[in-house]
């Protein structure tokens, strides 16, 4: 997938922008506060229906404006799509694909698989398990057409069960939820484990490129003891769950853990090494999607030079160029990108929310 054109209206300090992008690399240069990250945020929003910076729409809509509008032209081989999204201050979201109303954010997300690499993205490694579950679930969403409905049903059932836990006095009244919950828990966990295993070799191979001095290993944990039947566990833990007010064990506690030389990566790696590992994980997942589904990810790299030396920046850029992805890269100066000269690229300069092609 590639975005060939993007129109932005009233998104943060980007009041009126119309851009045509290169299918390869797009460099966005500007000082701090110029709107570089906001441009990446707008692209991300178009593909996810949410921001990676703020959950509050009013902070994203330009001052004294009722809404923001994003409109994009998307191309993949011989196919083209027109997508649009409007977010209003009242919270309403309007979406269109090829002129037709789109009711689900997942419709946009399916069209625009994206990998985001930002300085804050280290939470994938040093944050809680939810960040790593999201990493696995992103891959399954794009690989397995049945996953999203099962995942949505699982989350809905967990919410219903947690609400019921605060009202019931005996386990008998929970059985109606637990029969279906158990079925979905096993299905989602099976898919997660299979995907993690399929991704393992790609991760280890890519990590050898970026961190050859380390032996990186990965392991999947489903969220409860594999030797326990989940239905039995739910019944056994009823009193504890009721006291807590939520379901303690299950796929909502799953984790995908990383070790370097046998130790947790967050305990022994420097911040620079963690960023390299995070880049390797994002790259490996994007390349796995290309290999399995023949679909290219769009890569968004914010503050490209941060914590990466020139050699590693060049290595990452060469790998992205090789796999044929569309890439958006922000930097403060052109000098930070001087050794990265992909065959297909375009450079934009951003100042006070206004952008021009160089």
Curated annotation (Swiss-Prot):
Classification via InterPro entries: DNA-binding_RecF (IPR001238), DNA-binding_RecF_CS (IPR018078), P-loop_NTPase (IPR027417), RecF/RecN/SMC_N (IPR003395), RecF_2 (IPR042174)
Keyword set, alphabetical order: ATP-binding, Cytoplasm, DNA damage, DNA repair, DNA replication, DNA-binding, Nucleotide-binding, SOS response
Molecular function as annotated in GO: ATP binding; single-stranded DNA binding
SUPFAM superfamilies: P-loop containing nucleoside triphosphate hydrolases (SSF52540)
GO CC annotation terms, alphabetical: cytoplasm
Keyword DNA damage in record: yes
Origin: domain of life: Bacteria
Primary location recorded for the protein, binned into one broad class: cytoplasm
NCBIfam families, per database record: recf (TIGR00611)
Protein name stated in the entry: DNA replication and repair protein RecF
Organism of derivation: Histophilus somni (strain 129Pt) (Haemophilus somnus)
Classification lineage: Bacteria, Pseudomonadati, Pseudomonadota, Gammaproteobacteria, Pasteurellales
Designated gene of the protein: recF
């Amino acid at each position: 997938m590639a975005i060939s054109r993007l129109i932005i209206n009233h998104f943060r300090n980007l009041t009126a922008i119309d851009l045509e992008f290169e299918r390869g690399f797009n460099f966005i240069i500007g000082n701090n506060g110029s709107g570089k990250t906001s441009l990446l945020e707008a692209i991300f929003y178009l593909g996810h229906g949410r921001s990676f910076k703020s959950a509050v729409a009013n902070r994203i809509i330009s001052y004294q404006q009722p809404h923001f509008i994003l409109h994009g032209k998307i191309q993949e081989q011989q196919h083209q799509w027109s997508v649009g999204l409007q977010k209003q201050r009242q919270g309403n979201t309007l979406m269109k694909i090829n002129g037709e109303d789109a009711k689900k954010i997942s419709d946009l997300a399916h069209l625009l698989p994206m990998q985001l690499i930002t300085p804050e993205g280290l939470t994938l490694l040093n944050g809680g398990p939810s960040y790593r579950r999201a990493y696995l679930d992103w891959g399954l969403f794009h690989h397995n057409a049945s996953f999203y409905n099962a995942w949505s049903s699982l989350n809905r059932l967990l919410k219903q069960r947690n609400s019921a836990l605060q009202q019931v006095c005996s386990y008998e009244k929970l059985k109606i939820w637990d029969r279906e919950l158990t079925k979905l828990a096993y299905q989602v966990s099976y898919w997660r484990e299979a995907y993690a295993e399929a991704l393992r070799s790609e991760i280890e191979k890519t990590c050898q490129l970026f961190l050859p001095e380390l032996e990186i290993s990965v392991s999947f944990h489903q969220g409860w003891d594999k030797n326990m039947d989940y239905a039995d566990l739910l019944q056994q833990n009823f009193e504890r769950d009721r006291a807590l007010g939520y379901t303690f064990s299950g796929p909502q506690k799953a984790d995908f853990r990383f070790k370097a030389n046998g130790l947790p990566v967050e305990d022994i790696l420097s911040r620079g090494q963690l960023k390299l590992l995070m880049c390797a994980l994002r790259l490996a997942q994007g390349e796995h999607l290309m290999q399995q589904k023949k679909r290219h990810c769009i890569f968004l790299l914010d503050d490209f030079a941060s914590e990466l030396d020139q050699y590693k920046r060049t290595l990452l850029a060469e790998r992205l160029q090789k796999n044929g992805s569309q890439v958006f890269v922000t930097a403060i100066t052109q000098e930070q990108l001087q050794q990265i000269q992909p065959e297909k690229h375009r450079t934009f300069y951003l100042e006070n929310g206004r952008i021009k092609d160089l």
